[in-house]
Amino acid sequence: MIPGQYQIQPGDIELNAGRRTLSLTVANSGDRPIQVGSHFHFFETNDALTFDRAASRGMRLNIPAGTAVRFEPGQSREVELVDLAGLRKVYGFAGRVMGEL
């Protein structure tokens, strides 16, 4: 093995397999771009984003870890959300939950 070498098994990795997903239309009603990271509790995003907020409780963007989605002012786009996993306790973010979902 060469130092730093990767040994990757053949095949594909399916992200978030078996988790519930939801598609929502999200619009940026503000005057500045808004970027939302992969593991941000979508329910608690910037209030300038308009969407069915109640439906997004306990969910995050269904995108690879470390990536984000950017919403330009006036832009509307469809996003896919996925259920948060683990203990399903949410602390921090905008402070709208601060406990169990």
Curated annotation (Swiss-Prot):
Q: Which Gene3D superfamilies match?
A: Urease, beta subunit
Annotated GO CC locations? urease complex
Sorted keywords for this record are: Cytoplasm, Hydrolase
Record protein name field: Urease subunit beta
In Pfam terms, one family for this protein is: Urease_beta
Please list the reactions this protein catalyses.
Answer: urea + 2 H2O + H(+) = hydrogencarbonate + 2 NH4(+)
Question: What processes does the entry annotate via GO biological process terms?
Answer: urea catabolic process
EC code: 3.5.1.5
Gene Ontology MF, one: urease activity
- The superkingdom listed in its UniProt entry is Bacteria
Q: What class of enzyme is it?
A: hydrolase
Record's family?
Belongs to the urease beta subunit family.
- State the pathway, as annotated in the record: Nitrogen metabolism; urea degradation; CO(2) and NH(3) from urea (urease route): step 1/1
Subunit composition and interactions:
Heterotrimer of UreA (gamma), UreB (beta) and UreC (alpha) subunits. Three heterotrimers associate to form the active enzyme.
Which cell locations does it reside in? Cytoplasm
Protein's organism = Pseudomonas syringae pv. syringae (strain B728a)
